[in-house]
């Protein structure tokens, strides 16, 4: 999921101290592309071969515990160097600048978090430079990336809408919240709305911008409850939507009477499901799309599966164009399987 607020200054300090990113020497450059090749290939692999992840908000627990952990573990297993770069806060312009700063060093591959459509031009530059480039998490249209691997947000919204209709018996007032304007979440909102359309007695109150902030989500939820005392359900689309909605529902003493669904399956979300405050979670397979995305870069670099005499010269990209990794559905019946 995309951008999420850190809960406390103390946790931020602890996290930063625990998340030392590997050093990177910008003077180290990989081989340039053969003028006849569309991307750089290599017959050999070494510990100095560098794969770079470029994200934003690099200290977010969701990213640190899933994406970055999986990427680092993949590098250790494969015997190559992995580097994680990006701003500490949610800062798309700095993510773009980071991508552009990395390109001249020609790493073996770029794994880029699809945070915002605005990063498309920087991705196109990386591809034009012959760097194997995979976008993960959310698709970036017009980026010319070699591969996208991640979640189908429309489907995540549809799953929430279907479960909400089931929880409410097909009737009642509902609202959604997340980060307005982000392509993935807007797709999620559409999926939710399409799922409840067959139920004329379900009244859609609209979508609200919680800015991925727990306090903002709680305030919006409280305002919705105040303005609509008969509200029956709320659905969340960023990692902090669920905890914020849950806080408001608990404070209003409406647990079990206002049904909640949301994305992500962090420990806080799981505990709220176990406590009966949140009814349903749609989790992403973050470790899967990160590790597979990195492996696709390696396979492209080393021609693991050749589709022609020389894929780079033939203009053939020997990895999947698009991979949807699916979702994980969690409720009271299986939540115990996810609590560590």
Question: How does the language model describe each region?
Answer:
Residues 37-44, 48-78, 83-96, 113-117, ...:
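Extracytoplasmic "Venus flytrap"
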Residues 99-100, 108-127, 192, 210-272:
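Hydrophobic alpha-helical
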Residues 16-18:
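C-terminal motif of bacterial Sec signal peptides marking the signal peptidase cleavage site
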């Amino acid at each position: 999921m995309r951008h999420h607020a850190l809960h406390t200054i103390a946790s931020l300090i602890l996290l930063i101290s625990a998340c030392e990113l590997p050093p990177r020497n910008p003077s180290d450059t990989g081989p340039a592309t053969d003028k006849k090749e569309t991307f750089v290939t290599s017959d050999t692999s070494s510990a100095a071969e560098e794969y770079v992840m470029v994200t934003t908000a690099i200290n977010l627990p969701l990213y640190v515990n899933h994406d970055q952990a999986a990427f680092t573990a993949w590098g250790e297993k494969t015997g190559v160097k992995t580097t994680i770069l990006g701003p500490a806060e949610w800062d798309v312009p700095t993510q773009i600048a980071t991508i552009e700063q990395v390109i001249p060093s020609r790493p073996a591959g770029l794994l880029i978090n699809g945070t915002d459509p605005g990063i498309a031009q920087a991705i196109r530059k990386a591809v034009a430079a012959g760097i194997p480039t995979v976008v993960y998490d959310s698709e970036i249209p017009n980026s010319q990336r070699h591969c996208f691997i991640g979640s189908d947000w429309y489907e995540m919204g549809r799953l929430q809408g279907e479960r909400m209709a089931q929880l409410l018996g097909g009737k009642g007032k509902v609202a959604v919240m997340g980060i307005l304007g982000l392509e993935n979440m807007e797709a999620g909102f559409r999926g939710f709305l399409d799922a409840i359309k067959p139920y004329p007695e379900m009244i859609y109150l609209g979508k609200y911008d919680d800015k991925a902030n727990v306090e903002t989500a709680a305030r919006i939820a409280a305002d919705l409850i105040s303005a609509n005392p008969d509200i029956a359900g709320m659905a969340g689309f960023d990692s902090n939507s669920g905890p914020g909605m849950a806080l408001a529902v608990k404070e209003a003493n409406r647990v079990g009477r206002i049904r909640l669904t949301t994305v992500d399956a962090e420990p806080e979300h799981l505990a709220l499901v176990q406590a009966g405050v949140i009814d349903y979670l749609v989790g992403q397979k973050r470790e899967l799309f990160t590790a597979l995305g990195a492996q696709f870069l390696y396979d492209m670099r080393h021609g693991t599966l050749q589709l022609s005499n020389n894929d780079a010269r033939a203009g053939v990209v020997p990895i999947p164009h698009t991979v949807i990794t699916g979702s994980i559905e969690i409720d009271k019946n299986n939540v115990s399987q996810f609590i560590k």
